[in-house]
């Protein structure tokens, strides 16, 4: 270990002196790259000034931390470019050898971060940096470190490398272009490292590398051993108090760095998870995969701010401390939940099978002679079966008024004896018991069957049953005992429409219809007297209206006639014309006198041929009669009613004549 300290100590001091001389030029070039880099350098310088007032500066102990961090990040970027060209064997060798100085710089950079955090905690500034500030600081540090590590080259190469690093952040194509420049520097650094480190030290580093890869995390490489060596070299120079402060500051540093990582960096997340305590099997698998095939994501993860692996292992423990059991087994039982003797909740206990309860019972087996063929029969409403044997002593006839219902609630036809299948026991001549029935099934030559029940004949139809759902059971107390399974069913229909069963069925249907029908229609035996009465009343009313109409018309005609013949000689003939006219004059009194003596004679002479030779009085009378007849003919509606109206008119005329005579007598 002493040789390693001498080697690494001389290298660190030489690099610190060289980087101090070029820090001013590099900081100016970094400020031109962006405002974020200037802010980050300004914050680091402020923190260094505050740290100098409280305790001896870290620059005196370890040199310029910012320069070492820049070198470490630049070496990380070199690793990225080297691993992109991992197809050639020379690049793989340069990767392995270049990781040794870069890991030392990474460890020094992590200690620089710890010192900055320690100074920030001792000051009154309690606020943490946001994720954006952290990213800007990391970006500015990367640019600064890239420029400082390349100070041994010419100024043109420094500017070209700084531009290459900017293009690495923009796109992956720029990173591939800068890989050639990085390889030249890596070869230079490899030659210096080979000169300083002896073969014995390399063998010792390889042994320590194996031990650390088994204990810490799956991505262990030569970088880890070099970090550990650099830690061993720097530890004698640091006091115990500073170690305690660094170990205390490493805890928030780790948590802050974990918070700054984005979700897209899957490899970095896997590293952090392995540091926190992933399964040991997963770590071994990742180690084999990453040692065999180095990927770009691993190179990208190297550019992140490295963590102090030793401090992390001291704080959180190694991978061996993590149990490989599942989460469900390690969960403590919920408080208040009942726990069994083994410490497991009762819900997780396996349910014990409940023992079966068996009761042995002896039941006598009933053997019945069911015959060869079994048929399932659903009896129609016109058939019924009497299961008990027929006994004339206990036989009860059916009543007409009562309705007999079957087991399905249907009304059965009341055929009494004709539709009931019965059986009885009788003795033959020898005294043996014989079972007889009033029904039998006959099978004909064509395969059809018929049921003969007394004098009735029913057609029997056979059909198969679908499924084994119909069984024959017998009762054994409260239980049932299966006997057979039905495969075929039988249906019965009346043989003809002349049978008594068919007549009963039709009558029963008619009875049902008659019960529901409330109105009965009877044939008409004659005319309805009420209708005749109403018709006669209507006719009588029409006659009365016609008579009233005729009377009014006759009255009008008489009034018109009297107005035409009114004159002084007509009304008072004796006063004016007694001497002049004599018998030829027409007067009202003369007319009345003629009506008194010979009304009938006047009526007979109206149509006589002697009317032309008569006097003027006869002409006047004939004219009056003709007018009356014309008026009567116009008022009649039918030929039959004309005669009746004429008779009534004559009668009424007579009445008016009589009234006129009475008026004359009064005069």
From Swiss-Prot:
Superkingdom assignment: Eukaryota
Residues the record lists as Phosphothreonine modifications: 189
UniProt keyword annotations, A-Z: Acetylation, Activator, Nucleus, Phosphoprotein, Transcription, Transcription regulation, Wnt signaling pathway
Compositional bias annotation for Low complexity: 33-43, 317-326
Residue numbers bearing the Phosphoserine modification: 10, 14, 66, 151, 154, 162, 171, 179, 198, 206, 213, 221, 230, 239, 247, 255, 278, 280, 295, 297, 301, 608-609, 611, 615, 631, 659
Places the protein is found: Nucleus
A single cellular component GO annotation: Cdc73/Paf1 complex
Compositional bias per record (Acidic residues), positions renumbered to this chain: 1-14, 179-193, 575-584
Positions of region (Disordered): 1-362, 548-585, 602-667
Residues recorded with modification Phosphotyrosine: 607
Classification via InterPro entries: Leo1
A GO BP annotation: negative regulation of myeloid cell differentiation
Modified residues (N-acetylalanine): 2
Residue spans of biased composition, Basic and acidic residues class: 70-96, 104-161, 168-178, 194-219, 240-286, 548-562, 637-649
Biological function: Component of the PAF1 complex (PAF1C) which has multiple functions during transcription by RNA polymerase II and is implicated in regulation of development and maintenance of embryonic stem cell pluripotency. PAF1C associates with RNA polymerase II through interaction with POLR2A CTD non-phosphorylated and 'Ser-2'- and 'Ser-5'-phosphorylated forms and is involved in transcriptional elongation, acting both independently and synergistically with TCEA1 and in cooperation with the DSIF complex and HTATSF1. PAF1C is required for transcription of Hox and Wnt target genes.
Self-association state and partner proteins as the record states: Component of the PAF1 complex, which consists of CDC73, PAF1, LEO1, CTR9, RTF1 and SKIC8. The PAF1 complex interacts with PHF5A. Interacts with TCEA1, SUPT5H and CTNNB1. Interacts with SETD5.
Family: Belongs to the LEO1 family.
Protein name (record): RNA polymerase-associated protein LEO1
């Amino acid at each position: 270990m002493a040789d390693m300290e001498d080697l690494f100590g001389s290298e660190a001091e030489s690099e610190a002196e060289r980087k101090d001389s070029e820090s001013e030029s590099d900081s100016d070039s970094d400020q031109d790259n962006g405002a974020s880099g200037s802010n980050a350098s300004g914050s680091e310088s402020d923190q260094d000034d505050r740290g100098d007032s409280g305790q001896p500066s870290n620059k005196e102990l370890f040199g310029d931390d910012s320069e070492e961090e820049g070198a470490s990040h630049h070496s990380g970027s070199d690793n990225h470019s080297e691993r992109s060209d991992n197809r050639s064997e020379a690049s793989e060798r340069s990767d392995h050898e270049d990781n040794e100085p870069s890991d030392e710089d990474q460890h020094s950079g992590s200690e620089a971060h710890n010192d900055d955090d320690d100074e920030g905690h001792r000051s009154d500034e309690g606020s943490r940096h946001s994720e954006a500030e952290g990213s800007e600081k990391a970006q500015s540090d990367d640019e600064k470190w890239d420029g400082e590590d390349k100070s041994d080259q010419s100024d043109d190469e420094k500017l070209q490398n700084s531009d290459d690093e900017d293009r690495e952040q923009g796109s992956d194509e720029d990173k591939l272009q800068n890989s050639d420049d990085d390889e030249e520097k890596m070869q230079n650094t490899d030659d210096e490292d080979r000169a300083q480190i002896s073969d014995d030290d390399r063998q010792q580093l390889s042994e320590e590398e194996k031990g650390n890869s088994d204990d810490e995390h799956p991505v262990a490489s030569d970088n880890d051993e070099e970090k550990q060596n650099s830690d061993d070299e720097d530890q004698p120079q640091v006091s115990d108090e500073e170690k305690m402060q660094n170990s205390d500051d490493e805890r928030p540093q780790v948590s802050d760095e974990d918070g700054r990582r984005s979700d897209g960096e899957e490899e970095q997340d896997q590293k952090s998870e392995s540091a926190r305590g992933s399964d040991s099997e997963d770590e071994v698998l990742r180690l084999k995969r990453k040692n065999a095939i180095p990927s770009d994501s691993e190179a990208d993860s190297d550019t992140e701010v490295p963590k102090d692996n030793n401090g992390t292992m001291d704080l959180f423990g190694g991978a061996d401390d993590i149990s490989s059991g599942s989460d469900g087994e390690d969960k403590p039982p919920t408080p208040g939940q009942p726990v069994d003797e083994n410490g497991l909740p009762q819900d997780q206990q396996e349910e014990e099978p409940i023992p079966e309860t068996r009761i042995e019972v002896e039941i006598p087996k009933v053997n019945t002679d069911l015959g060869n063929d079994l048929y399932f029969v659903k009896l129609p409403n016109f058939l019924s079966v009497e299961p008990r044997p027929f006994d004339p002593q206990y036989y009860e006839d059916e009543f007409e008024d009562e309705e007999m219902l079957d087991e399905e609630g249907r009304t059965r036809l009341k055929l009494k004896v004709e539709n009931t299948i019965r059986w009885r026991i009788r003795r033959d001549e020898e005294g043996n018991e014989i079972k007889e029935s009033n029904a039998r099934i006959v099978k004909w030559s064509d395969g059809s069957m018929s049921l003969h029940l007394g004098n009735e004949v029913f057609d029997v139809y056979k059909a198969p049953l679908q499924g084994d759902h119909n069984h024959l059971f017998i009762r054994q107390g409260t239980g049932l005992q299966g006997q057979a399974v039905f495969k075929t069913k039988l249906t019965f229909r009346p043989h003809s429409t002349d049978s008594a069963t068919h007549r009963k069925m039709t009558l029963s249907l008619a009875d049902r219809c008659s019960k529901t029908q409330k109105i009965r229609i009877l044939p008409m035996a004659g005319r309805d007297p009420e209708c005749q009465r109403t018709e006669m009343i209507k006719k009588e009313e029409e006659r009365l209206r016609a008579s009233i109409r005729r009377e009014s018309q006759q009255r009008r005609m008489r009034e018109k006639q009297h107005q035409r013949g009114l004159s002084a000689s007509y009304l008072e003939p004796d006063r004016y014309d007694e001497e002049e006219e004599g018998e030829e004059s027409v007067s009202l009194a003369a007319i009345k006198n003629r009506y008194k003596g010979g009304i009938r004679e006047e009526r007979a002479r109206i149509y006589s041929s002697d009317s032309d030779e008569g006097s003027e009085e006869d002409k006047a009378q004939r004219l009056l009669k003709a007018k009356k007849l014309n008026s009567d003919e116009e008022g009649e509606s039918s030929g039959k009613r004309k005669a009746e109206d004429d008779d009534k008119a004559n009668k009424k005329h007579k009445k008016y004549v009589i009234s006129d005579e009475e008026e004359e007598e009064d005069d």
